Design a protein with these regions (language model features):
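The conserved Walker
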Residues: 42-43
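Hydrophobic positions on the alpha1 helix immediately C-terminal to the Walker A/P-loop
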Residues: 50
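Conserved nucleotide-sensing/catalytic segment adjacent to the nucleotide-binding pocket
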Residues: 60-66, 70-132, 137
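Small-molecule kinase domains that catalyze NTP-dependent phosphoryl transfer to phosphate-bearing small molecules
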Residues: 171-216, 231-234
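N-terminal pre-Walker A segment at the start of P-loop NTPase domains
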Residues: 1-29
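A glycine- and Lys/Arg-enriched "phosphate-lid" helix/loop adjacent to the NTP-binding pocket
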Residues: 139-185
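Conserved lysine of the Walker
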Residues: 47
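Extended intrinsically disordered terminal tails
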Residues: 213-371
Length: 371
């Protein structure tokens, strides 16, 4: 693969020695028992909040921060690339920034400094290799990971990008394939870390950076039965609350407004992608409003729900005409309402609901024939 922006060896070395090492290494002091904090999470998950927590953890002893993204501005071509091709600037400079980060880690370990390694941790084998090396060097190793739903982190990627682009004319973007690869890889890493006793402490956090799971090694065994894999899956896949859906929909409304501004010069593809996500977010919100709020309030927010409510009433009338107990009618209507809500989430409520009266009628006819 061609690397046209890779620096010559002398320039590469000079920048590391005179700028990177000179800036990062003096911020810490050697430790008798050094600690390495490794972060994890797909792009947009909020890993920066974990770095902030680690910085506070090391406020007295200092630390060496290892983060290739933080080193990119040291590359002489990076800012120009950000102005002309901000979505690929990171990849185009990684031939230098990756080795700089690795060397900074090596120098920090040799100096027995506390270390914060800000990364996605999407590769279980790479994490295992890193933790083995750190432990052999006398480090206590912690893994702190964001357990965040893919929908939330995807939205945050766009919000970060648009915010940076609005402020400075360019922004840092993560492509969907990179996001999805990391999303799957981080989960695999968490499970491998706990199964293999790869770290001394493992902490999972929700999207607000609140801890939801913690386990520690004590005398070579986990203090609690391993459950990080299940905890991460549960948090990532739990349904959004009504308030979370409101915030999610509002986020895409704001993004759509940003892209609509003439000075943004958004491409049709960018506008279309956000519009699609905006529609999906609105459908998710409408479905939860349908589930939780009274029809009058729901239709004030989403007038298009009127058809769904009308069809539900028709099904209810049909059900009431059949020889069902009150409990049976309640069970049927609960199932109907949830099916309608699921259809609203998919954006095809009217089409799906219209079929329900026919199914109810068909079941009634079958019972009549059996009598």
């Amino acid at each position: 693969m061609s690397t046209p922006y890779k620096l010559g060896a002398e320039r590469h070395e000079s920048i590391y020695t005179n700028k990177i090492a000179a800036r990062y290494l003096p911020r810490s002091k050697p430790q008798e028992q050094p600690t390495a904090v490794i972060t994890g999470g797909q792009p947009g998950s909020g890993k920066s909040s974990l770095t902030a927590l680690a910085v506070n953890q090391f406020r007295d002893s200092g630390y060496v921060l290892v983060d290739a993204d933080k080193l990119r501005p040291f590359h002489p071509d990076y800012r120009r690339l950000m102005r002309t091709d901000d979505r690929n600037a990171a990849n185009l400079t990684h031939a230098d920034c990756g080795p700089w980060a690795n060397r900074l880690l090596r120098d920090g370990v040799e100096g027995r400094r506390n270390i914060i390694i800000d990364q996605t941790s999407r590769d279980p084998e790479a994490l295992a290799k890193m933790t083995v090396g750190l432990r052999q060097a006398g480090y206590r190793v912690e893994l702190h990971v964001m357990a965040v739903a893919a929908a939330v982190s995807e939205q945050r990627i766009h919000e970060r990008y648009e915010g940076q682009k609005e402020a400075s004319g360019f922004g840092r973007f993560s492509t969907k394939d990179k996001h999805d690869e990391a999303y799957a890889g981080v989960h695999a890493t968490v499970g491998a870390a706990e199964r293999g006793n790869l770290v001394d402490r493992l902490v999972l956090y929700d999207k607000s950076a609140q801890p939801i799971y913690e386990n520690r090694l004590e005398n070579g065994a986990w203090r609690s039965a391993p459950g990080a894999d299940q905890a991460m899956k549960a948090e990532r896949t739990r349904p959004m609350t009504l308030q979370e859906r409101r915030e999610y929909a509002a986020g895409f409304d704001a993004l759509a407004d940003k892209l609509a501004r003439p000075e943004r010069k958004a491409t049709p593809e960018e506008v279309g992608r956000i519009a699609e996500m905006q529609r999906n977010a609105r459908s998710l919100l409408a479905a939860e409003v349908f589930r939780q709020e009274k029809p009058e309030a729901a239709m004030r927010q989403f007038p298009e729900l009127a058809t769904a409510y009308a069809n539900v009433r028709a099904i209810e009338a049909k059900t009431n005409s059949e020889r069902l107990t009150a409990q049976q009618r309640e069970t049927v209507m609960a199932r109907v309402r949830e099916n309608v809500a699921a259809s609203i989430e998919r954006g095809d409520a009217a089409k799906v609901v219209r079929a329900e009266p026919e199914r109810v009628s068909h079941r009634s006819q079958e019972r009549d024939l059996k009598r």
